[in-house]
């Protein structure tokens, strides 16, 4: 049976004592996190710290073994209907674009609204054009992914997620696979999205983006949340030695 639960202070996302293992490896250790509507969170930390696993658990791409995850009042549990409902409200952009190479940019963006939300084709196309314009790439709507740059493909991936009208956007190192000259165009798109009031969680090493956009920066290491604070406090006065060591490596 579908279950709708109250969350702390009308939170959009709540993780309570979340644990996950890969075999014997304890990848997430008692993660507690509350995200309010419209809040913009940046997760940072060294490779293998559990950042990506944390956000992938939020839309059940990874399954947690202990604890509770509640998204927009819906608990993620074994009920497949709950998982499907959450996924309709959560967009995700990955390191790699995962666009269908045999479909045009426009078709990539209309596929999910037509098949999942049962949207009429014309309405889905109008919506796709709207979001392609928003990410400044509408002129490429009828091209195939292989005909545009990596940065442009990542902006298409963002538009594709927005076409499902999500309440939450998750970004898993969206610029890490891009050439340096393409990073800015994707970050600018994400900054515009953040300014629109979208609830966002972003795993990234782009500390300039974190300073500009985040309401809160969370540092993870060895499967734990080590430290979290507003950007000014986080970067100026990190409390943990582990945080200071990490920042010394990524800020030049």
Swiss-Prot record:
Which Pfam families does the record match to this protein? ABC_tran
Q: For ATP, which residues are the binding ones?
A: 45-52
**GO: which molecular function terms?**
ABC-type amino acid transporter activity; ATP binding; ATP hydrolysis activity
Task: Write down the superkingdom of origin.
Answer: Bacteria
Where in the numbering of this chain does the ABC transporter domain appear?
Answer: 13-247
**InterPro entries xref list:** AAA+_ATPase, ABC_ATPase_HisP-typ, ABC_transporter-like_ATP-bd, ABC_transporter-like_CS, MetN_ABC_transporter-like, P-loop_NTPase
Topology of the protein relative to the lipid bilayer: Peripheral membrane protein
Q: Which GO terms describe its cellular component?
A: ATP-binding cassette (ABC) transporter complex; ATP-binding cassette (ABC) transporter complex, substrate-binding subunit-containing; membrane
PROSITE patterns, per database record: ABC_TRANSPORTER_1, ABC_TRANSPORTER_2
Write out the entry's keywords from A to Z. Amino-acid transport, ATP-binding, Cell inner membrane, Cell membrane, Membrane, Nucleotide-binding, Transport
Subcellular localization, as worded in the UniProt entry: Cell inner membrane
Question: What SMART domains does the database record attribute to this sequence?
Answer: AAA (SM00382)
PANTHER family with a match to the protein in the record? AMINO ACID IMPORT ATP-BINDING PROTEIN, PHOSPHONATES IMPORT ATP-BINDING PROTEIN PHNC
What does the UniProt record say this protein does?
Probably part of a binding-protein-dependent transport system YdhWXYZ for an amino acid. Probably responsible for energy coupling to the transport system.
Homology family: Belongs to the ABC transporter superfamily.
> What protein name does the entry list?
Uncharacterized amino-acid ABC transporter ATP-binding protein YhdZ
- Species of origin reads Escherichia coli (strain K12)
The organism's lineage is: Bacteria, Pseudomonadati, Pseudomonadota, Gammaproteobacteria, Enterobacterales
């Amino acid at each position: 049976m579908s279950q709708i639960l109250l969350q702390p202070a009308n939170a959009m996302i709540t993780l309570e004592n979340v644990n996950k293992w890969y075999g014997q490896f304890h990848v997430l250790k008692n993660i507690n996190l509350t995200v309010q509507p419209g809040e913009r969170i940046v997760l940072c930390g060294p490779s293998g710290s559990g950042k990506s696993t944390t956000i992938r658990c939020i839309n059940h791409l990874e399954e947690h073994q202990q604890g509770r995850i509640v998204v927009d009042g819906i608990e993620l549990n074994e009920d497949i209907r709950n998982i499907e409902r959450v996924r309709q409200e959560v967009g995700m952009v990955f390191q790699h674009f995962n666009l269908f190479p045999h479909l045009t940019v426009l078709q990539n963006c209309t596929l999910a609204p037509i098949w999942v939300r049962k949207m009429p084709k014309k309405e889905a196309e109008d919506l796709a054009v709207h979001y392609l314009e928003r990410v400044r790439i509408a002129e490429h709507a009828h091209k195939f992914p292989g005909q545009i740059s990596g940065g442009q493909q990542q902006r298409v991936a963002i538009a594709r997620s927005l076409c499902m009208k999500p309440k939450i956007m998750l970004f898993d190192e969206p610029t890490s696979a891009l050439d340096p000259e393409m990073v800015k165009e994707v970050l600018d798109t994400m900054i515009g999205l953040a300014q629109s009031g979208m609830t966002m969680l972003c795993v990234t090493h782009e500390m300039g983006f974190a300073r500009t956009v985040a309401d809160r920066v969370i540092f993870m290491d060895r499967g734990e949340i080590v430290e979290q604070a507003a950007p000014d406090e986080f970067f100026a006065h990190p409390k943990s030695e582990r945080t200071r060591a990490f920042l010394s490596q990524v800020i030049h």
